[in-house]
Amino acid sequence: MSTQTVTIKSLGAQGDGIAHCPDGPVYVPFALPGETVAIAKVKDQGTVMSITEASADRRDPVCRHFGPEGINGTCGGCSLQHLADQPYHAFKRELVVSALRSKGLTPPVDDLVICRPGERRRAVFAARKTEKGLLLGFSQANSHHIVAIEECPVTSPGIVSRFDAIRAIGLSMVANAEPFRITVLETLSGLDISVEGIKSVNDKQRRTLTETVLAMRGIARVSLSGEILIEPQKPIIEFGGIPVSPPAGGFTQATKQAEDAMAELMLAHVGKSKRIADLFCGSGTFALRLARIGRVHAVEAEDKALKALDFAARNTQGLKPVSVEKRDLFRRPLMTSELKNYDAVVFDPPRAGAEVQCKELARSTVKKIVAVSCNPLTLARDLAILTEGGYRVTRVTPVDQFLWSPHVEAVAVLEK
């Protein structure tokens, strides 16, 4: 380890400040462009020891757990709370612009859709049993160390206010000091708590869990690795006003605000399409909204998610027909011959993107496509495939679903 004073030239894709040293770039978390900082350097990583000259874009973080001086350690949940709003918004938009540019794409890119603090309805916590109880928080960046949190300005107050209840539920299920994960989804009927990383619970633990949950208010369900352990109330969320009970541990957009913004962009482009395919549809985030305007074929690999979607569609009046298909689109994409049945296609894949499916789409005659992605790099790759097939990207909109992190959602609309 060496100590030296450096000047930060730019922000990297992970939100770290980048300094240029004789032996190459050095990445310095929590440092901003234009700042002069003293760092402790190990290989290409720097730790801020002091700030000699601060940037005018620096601001005080809103959370006590943020940064090198955070309470209980440096929480890895956020990396950009110290950056003022305007340059922060520009940074997020540039993540999308630069990813597109790397594939030779220069479509119109909208300003960032801004999401507010306290909107995150789904959070994944790290947890571990200790002598004092249950340690609950987020892992420190690039570390297995769990930073115990007492607040979280990103997460919904409906979750933050129940930290004690979440700890009690986790503690009733765990027998050793191995770390595990607790995913909490705030639903209209209470918290939906999904635990992963614990192999099993015995009969005594089940009884303790049941007693713990029934003594509380506002807990809808507790599950372990997808198995429902107790469900006082069926968890309910709404997709465009349509009630859905998502599967235990299933995927849900992190914030309703971002989901609504993405859905609005999607619906505006799909317009009056009569036959629509929703690929990687999950529990119906977009499919159920689309069914108000046209027939929908919803495709997803997760059986429980499809069943939730199907049940919601069958029990909602006023929707056009919705068909569902269980299918692994990474291995068995909809072929060009199948795609000829649709006027519009919407796809929202995991971070890996939809490369194989896009190769089929590129050869199709589908008039309108909406691509939703949480990874600008794989989105750019997929859009490049589609443009090579004759599609034109008419608009890309970045959405700040992951506040104060280096991650960004984006919606791209295409036509042929």
Swiss-Prot record:
Its EC number is 2.1.1.-. SUPFAM superfamilies: Nucleic acid-binding proteins, S-adenosyl-L-methionine-dependent methyltransferases. The keyword Repeat does not apply. It comes from the Bacteria. S-adenosyl-L-methionine binds at residues 253, 280, 300, 348. Keywords: 4Fe-4S, Iron, Iron-sulfur, Metal-binding, Methyltransferase, S-adenosyl-L-methionine, Transferase. The keyword Manganese does not apply. One of its GO terms (biological process) is rRNA base methylation. Pfam families: TRAM, tRNA_U5-meth_tr. Belongs to the class I-like SAM-binding methyltransferase superfamily. RNA M5U methyltransferase family. PANTHER family: 23S RRNA (URACIL(1939)-C(5))-METHYLTRANSFERASE RLMD (PTHR11061:SF49), RNA M5U METHYLTRANSFERASE (PTHR11061). This is Uncharacterized RNA methyltransferase Atu0735. It comes from Agrobacterium fabrum (strain C58 / ATCC 33970).
